[in-house]
Amino acid sequence: MRVAIYPGSFDPVTYGHIDIIKRGANLFDKLIVAVLLNPAKRPLFSIQERIELLKEVTKDIPNVEVDYFDGLLVEYAKKVNASAIIKGLRMVSDFEYEFQMALVNKKLNPSVETIFLMTSPKYGYLSSSLVKEIAQFGGCLSEFVPDIVAERLMEKFKKS
């Protein structure tokens, strides 16, 4: 079975992420969407909330699983028997960092390949940070995230 990991913070998941998830799922028997648990960051959504939202928005993609990890991605790849890491690239500026990470991951675990998928042009500008900023000021989110994500974002910003 060909298994790949699509890692990220997904805080929150956007249509850009979902685009990469669907395309990655078409390339592998199983795609694990893996939420990074990074204690150095202060995410808007808890790890449980991000997992729940990802499960909801991927429920119609049968070969997608949602999980979380901390530590080294290549160690997680070993644990789940993944042979590939999928990374979405929005623009050239993403490539420099992601290429460096791919080389480090290859050095740490030569059996894991990194596959870069270019973001669909209609999502090239989209980021979770941008979505949070729009939500914070009460802007319309329908072009950026599924309804369930927009609802949760608005709830978060009403509380603050």
Curated annotation (Swiss-Prot):
SUPFAM superfamilies: Nucleotidylyl transferase. It is found in: Cytoplasm. Substrate binds at residues 9, 41, 73, 87. Its cofactor is Mg(2+). ATP binds at residues 9-10, 17, 88-90, 98, 123-129. GO terms for molecular function: ATP binding; pantetheine-phosphate adenylyltransferase activity. InterPro entries: Cyt_trans-like, PPAT, Rossmann-like_a/b/a_fold. Pathway: Cofactor biosynthesis; coenzyme A biosynthesis; CoA from (R)-pantothenate: step 4/5. Reversibly transfers an adenylyl group from ATP to 4'-phosphopantetheine, yielding dephospho-CoA (dPCoA) and pyrophosphate. NCBIfam families: coaD_prev_kdtB, cyt_tran_rel. Belongs to the bacterial CoaD family. This is Phosphopantetheine adenylyltransferase. The lineage of its organism: Bacteria, Bacillati, Bacillota, Clostridia, Thermoanaerobacterales.
